[in-house]
C-alpha cells in the first residue's frame, strides 16, 4: 500500500447487503445527519442502479470494535439506506409498465432465508427476477480510509461543505466538540423524540430514530413533532435541521442574554470553540455552560417547553 491510508474497490450490492446484515456499517451521530430521503428519492437512486448509471463514491472509515472489523459511514448513508430498504421490501420502484414493484426476496439466499423465517414479508407485485439480479450485481464504488476521529470529522465537513449537500446547521453540528454543540444535540433529540443511548449506531438502527412520515412504518413521524404540529417549522425545514438551529439560538440567548444575536454569523462563532482565545464568543458560552451546568440548562428548557405544551393543549 506504500503507506497510502486510502483503498478503493468495487463491492456488489449483494455483498454490501451481506455487510449490512452482519452489522458492519456504523453511523456516528456526532456528525452524521438523520435519514431524511423521501421514498421518491430512494426509488430514484434504485432506478439508477437498475439502469447501470454511474453513482457517487461511498466513503468509509475502517474501524475495529471489540476485535470486529466495521466501516463507519462518512459519505453515502442515505444511498446505503435506500438500497437496504428496497431489498427488504420497505418500498417499491416504478417499472416501465407503470406498475410499482417490490424486490423479489428469492433473489438472494439471505433475503429468502429471512422471508422463510418470517423476518421479512414479500410484498407484491414483485419486480422481475432478472432486474433484481441486475440490481444486486451492481458494483458500488467503495473507498476505505484509515484515520483518527478528528480527521474523519474534518473529511465529512469538507465533503459536505463543498458539495452543498448539507444545510449550514448540519455542517456546524458535524463533529462539533464542546458543551454547547452537545447541549443543542441533546435538547433537539428530546424535543423530536429520537434520543439514542450512544452516538455510534448500526445502520439498521438508524431508521428507528430518523425522520419519517405516515407512509413509512418506522422512525419519528414528522407530522407529530412539536415544531411541525405548531406550524413553527415546515417538514422540508425539519429535514435540514432548522429545529436544531432554532434551539441553538434559544439556548444561546438563555445562556448569554443580549451578548448574542439570532444570526447565522453568531451561530458560526458559537460552534467554533477555541480554548486558546479567551475573547472568543464560543469560549464564553462554554465557560457559562460549565458554570451553570448542562443538566440544569436542559431542565430549564424542558420545563418551559412542557409549560408551553400544557397551555396549547
Question: Which stretches of residues belong to each language-model region?
Answer:
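C-terminal subdomains that position terminal phosphate/3'-OH groups for nucleotidyl transfer/ligation
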Residues: 242-313
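Acidic, carboxylate-rich catalytic segments that either coordinate divalent cations
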Residues: 1-17, 301-312
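Basic- and aromatic-enriched surface patches that contact anionic nucleotides/nucleic acids
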Residues: 2-7, 11, 32-38, 43-256
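Conserved aromatic/hydrophobic "specificity hotspots" at molecular recognition or selectivity sites
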Residues: 20
Amino acid at each position: 500500500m506504500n503507506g497510502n491510508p486510502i483503498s478503493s474497490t468495487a463491492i456488489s450490492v449483494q455483498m454490501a447487503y451481506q455487510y449490512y446484515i452482519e452489522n458492519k456499517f456504523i453511523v456516528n451521530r456526532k456528525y452524521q445527519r438523520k435519514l431524511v430521503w423521501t421514498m421518491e428519492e430512494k426509488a430514484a437512486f434504485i432506478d439508477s442502479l437498475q439502469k447501470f448509471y454511474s453513482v457517487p463514491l461511498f466513503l468509509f472509515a475502517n474501524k475495529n470494535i471489540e476485535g470486529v472489523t466495521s466501516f463507519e459511514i462518512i459519505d453515502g448513508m442515505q444511498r446505503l439506506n435506500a438500497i437496504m430498504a428496497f431489498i427488504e421490501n420497505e418500498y417499491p420502484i416504478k417499472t416501465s409498465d407503470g406498475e410499482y414493484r417490490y424486490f423479489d426476496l428469492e433473489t438472494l439466499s439471505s433475503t429468502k432465508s429471512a422471508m422463510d423465517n418470517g423476518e421479512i414479508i414479500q410484498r407484491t407485485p414483485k419486480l422481475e427476477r432478472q432486474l433484481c439480479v441486475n440490481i444486486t450485481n451492481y458494483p458500488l464504488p467503495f473507498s476505505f480510509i484509515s484515520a483518527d476521529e478528528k480527521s474523519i470529522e474534518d473529511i465529512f465537513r469538507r465533503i459536505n461543505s463543498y458539495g452543498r449537500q448539507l444545510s449550514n446547521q448540519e455542517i456546524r453540528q458535524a463533529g462539533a466538540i464542546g458543551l454547547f454543540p452537545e447541549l443543542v444535540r441533546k435538547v433537539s433529540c428530546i424535543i423530536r423524540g429520537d434520543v439514542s443511548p450512544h452516538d455510534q449506531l448500526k445502520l439498521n438502527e438508524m431508521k428507528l430514530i430518523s425522520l419519517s412520515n405516515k407512509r413509512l412504518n418506522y422512525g419519528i413521524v414528522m407530522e407529530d413533532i412539536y415544531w411541525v404540529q405548531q406550524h413553527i417549522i415546515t417538514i422540508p425545514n425539519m429535514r435540514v435541521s432548522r429545529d436544531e438551529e432554532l434551539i441553538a439560538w434559544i439556548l444561546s440567548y438563555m445562556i448569554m442574554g443580549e451578548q448574542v444575536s439570532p444570526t447565522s454569523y453568531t451561530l458560526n462563532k458559537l460552534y467554533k470553540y477555541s480554548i486558546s482565545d479567551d475573547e472568543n464568543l464560543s469560549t464564553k458560552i462554554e465557560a457559562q455552560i460549565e458554570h451553570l451546568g448542562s443538566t440544569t440548562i436542559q431542565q430549564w428548557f424542558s420545563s418551559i417547553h412542557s409549560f408551553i405544551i400544557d397551555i396549547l393543549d
